[in-house]
Amino acid sequence: MTLPHLSAVLLSVATFLVACQSTAAPSLMPSTGEWPNEPGGFLAMTNQPWNDLANHGWNRRDSTDDRIVADADAPSSPGATLEYIYPAGFPGGTAPATHYFPLDGRKELFVGLQWKVSSPWQGHSSAVNKMQFLYAKGADVAMVMYGPPAGPFEIRVMPQWREHGGAWLTPNVNRRTLALGKWHSVEWYLKYESAYGAGDGIVRWWVNRELAGNYTHVRFPDDEGFVEYQISPTWGGVGDSKTRSEYFRFDHSYISVPGPEHE
């Protein structure tokens, strides 16, 4: 099973390639130590607090319904969170905004984010509510909040390259229903194969510090690694429309990679 409308994915790939050609990745920094499942020896590329819509090496595009808002329950910075607004009538197949960060060809990385979904939340009729993406030069992998329009919802991962074959990576360790209206800690680790075709690539993710999915025989594309990270929470699928105003919110967003001695 593949995510709907591959043509839209390919258009997005082409768009980000043009946008990132002149964008250099920043210097590495010491790990913050705030993410319990971050591998040892990793260094931070970014620890974005979301006190502005575009700073600290991040950029934005196609952004019409994003803003910085306070959230008293936010775990790290209650005075400032990034909010994506889905107003009543919002159509499927688009995101309220896209925020992106350059990765300069990484084959192993860790992502940590703090994320909240409004309550109530109207899921898309396709069951797909996309959260975040990692882009290589010809394909991407998406993390998705998956479930029917009224829920329940869980987090799944979909590698969208031909080597993978189109199957969902579903929670295979701990399967939990996501609570709406609450902040969640989401951690994501990916590592390319030791050699193309080896079949030993890794995709893992944790929800609220608990391992949800662990896949250690994942095929990856034959390329130079991930070149861009995106928060681009596309609703759907195509078709369908929001019947009320809802939101996604993000507090800190963190990305780290192996230090020189661990590469």
List PLM regions with ranges.
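Bacterial N-terminal signal peptides
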Residues: 8-19
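Low-complexity, Ser/Thr/Pro/Gly-rich disordered linker/stalk regions
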Residues: 25-263
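Bacterial Sec-dependent signal peptides at the C-terminal "C-region" and cleavage site
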Residues: 17-27
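N-terminal secretory signal peptides that target proteins for export/translocation
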Residues: 1-3
